[in-house]
Every structure is written in structure tokens, then in C-alpha cells.
Amino acid sequence: MIRIGQGFDVHQLVPQRPLIIGGVTLPYEKGLLGHSDADVLTHAIIDAILGAAGLGDIGQLFPETDPQFKNANSVNLLKKVNEKVGRSGFTIGNIDCTILAEEPKMSPYLAEMKKNLAASCHLAVTQVNIKATTMETMGFVGKKEGIGAIAVALLEK
């Protein structure tokens, strides 16, 4: 059986927070606001994987009302999701994602993001693809008010 899931996440850019995307801390004057580390890419991937497995979403598994997830490392949450999906008999075939950001430029960090995310799911780097694009100055992303991410995951059983 093959299952496909999609995930989407956005977070607001604010001062005095680190900018963590795909488990990589990027040098930038703002970071993403959230209960956890607000890693928008990893959150979208988590939702894509959970959706494909029919296991709910990130908010159900790691609610922001639970203090144990305050400032949580999202890559560690992804590891837990991978374990949960594995216990359900699924393996991840591949993950494909797109980061939506006006700034900073993502290209220098994509290889490290792929490595982090692949390792956390016990995948080969070739099973994870990450792209980045701008919103051509339109909307909240284009106005540099936030960053978004879209992910698709293929699971096999």
C-alpha cells in the first residue's frame, strides 16, 4: 500500500528568536515565533508524514498547551513521528518540500537541512528534497512578516 500526505505550516518572523529551519540555525536578525523552536519546514514534514499514515497532525501529537513541548527541538519531534509511523507498519519512501521565504536566502543551507531531516527519519539524503522560493514581494511572506513551508511525504506499507 502506498499513501501520500501533505503538510503546510507558517510562522511569524519576530525579533529576539533564533531562525531554525530544517534543524539548521540560520544567521538572521529575526526568528520564527512559536511554542516549540518554530521550525516551519520540519513542522510541515511532520504533518505530511502523519497525514499519509492517517495519524492526525502535529497539534494533536504535540499540543502547544503542553509545557513539555515549550522550545522543543522540532527535529527531535520528527524522530518521534518517524518511530510512531514505523510502529504502524509504514516506511517513508520520500519527502519533497518547498520553503516560502523572501529572506534569508536558503540555498546555502539546503544541503545541511536535507542531511538533518534524512538522518532523523533514517533515510538516504536522496530521499529528501528541499526547494526554496520567494513570494515575489506579495503577501505576508513577501513582506518579510513570516516564512512558510509545504511538504509531501510518500509512505509505503
UniProtKB/Swiss-Prot annotation:
Tell me which domain of life the UniProt entry assigns to the organism this sequence originates from: Bacteria
Q: Where is this site: Transition state stabilizer?
A: H35, T134
Any one Gene Ontology MF annotation carried by this entry is:
metal ion binding
Q: How is the cofactor bound?
A: Binds 1 divalent metal cation per subunit.
The protein's annotated catalytic reaction(s) are: 4-CDP-2-C-methyl-D-erythritol 2-phosphate = 2-C-methyl-D-erythritol 2,4-cyclic diphosphate + CMP
Instruction: Name the top EC class.
Output: lyase
Q: Where does 4-CDP-2-C-methyl-D-erythritol 2-phosphate bind?
A: 9-11, 35-36, 57-59, 62-66, 133-136, 140, 143
How far does the signal peptide extend, from start to end residue? Answer: none
- Name a Pfam family for this protein: YgbB
Looking up SUPFAM superfamilies in the UniProt record yields:
IpsF-like
- Could you tell me the Gene Ontology terms of the biological process aspect for this record? isopentenyl diphosphate biosynthetic process, methylerythritol 4-phosphate pathway; terpenoid biosynthetic process
Q: Which cofactor does it need?
A: a divalent metal cation
Positions that bind a divalent metal cation: D9, H11, H43
Entry keywords, A to Z: Isoprene biosynthesis, Lyase, Metal-binding
Pathway named in the protein's UniProt entry: Isoprenoid biosynthesis; isopentenyl diphosphate biosynthesis via DXP pathway; isopentenyl diphosphate from 1-deoxy-D-xylulose 5-phosphate: step 4/6
EC numbers, comma separated: 4.6.1.12
> What is its biological role?
Involved in the biosynthesis of isopentenyl diphosphate (IPP) and dimethylallyl diphosphate (DMAPP), two major building blocks of isoprenoid compounds. Catalyzes the conversion of 4-diphosphocytidyl-2-C-methyl-D-erythritol 2-phosphate (CDP-ME2P) to 2-C-methyl-D-erythritol 2,4-cyclodiphosphate (ME-CPP) with a corresponding release of cytidine 5-monophosphate (CMP).
Spell out the family assignment given in the record's similarity comment: Belongs to the IspF family.
- Subunit structure, as described in the record: Homotrimer.
What name goes with this protein? 2-C-methyl-D-erythritol 2,4-cyclodiphosphate synthase
Supply the source organism for this entry.
Enterococcus faecalis (strain ATCC 700802 / V583)
